[in-house]
Amino acid sequence: MKILKNEYIRQSFITGLVVFALYLGITHTFHPFIVSGNSMQPTYHSGQIVTTITTYTQSDIKTGSVVIFKNNGKKLIKRVVGVPGDTLVIIDGTLYINGEKDDSEFAAIDVAGTLSNELTLKNNEYFVMGDNREADNSRDSRTFGAVSYEQIIGIVDKTIGER
């Protein structure tokens, strides 16, 4: 009888550990985020729900990654256009990265905002912009400057639905 009781306790403990590990894995690896506003159109629109990967290293954040970050207490979603070491400038509505004209998917949109002086990103800084880059459509690094690695909450993984 004592052997059965000890086996039951051992199995319960193992089951509890597995459940706890799954809980931690799910809640600390993936996090849902509801897109608000039109700054990321046409890629994402208001009301879409995206999942973010919240366990990542600095090398996982690349040019083109879409990230969720905190700025003045608000969570925002933007695309990374500049990574540590990059030099950026906006001249006549065109974004230049490391002296090269931005040729990304959203480069055809005239870039509003100012970055008339070259900005070289420090070791933990990222330059982020909304995909909807016309005037007043995106509050991003053109407005509030570079985003630090510590401000980034997660990297967008996929869209899972609508609110």
Set out the residue ranges of the language-model regions.
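Protein maturation boundaries and topogenic segments
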Residues: M1-K75, V147-R163
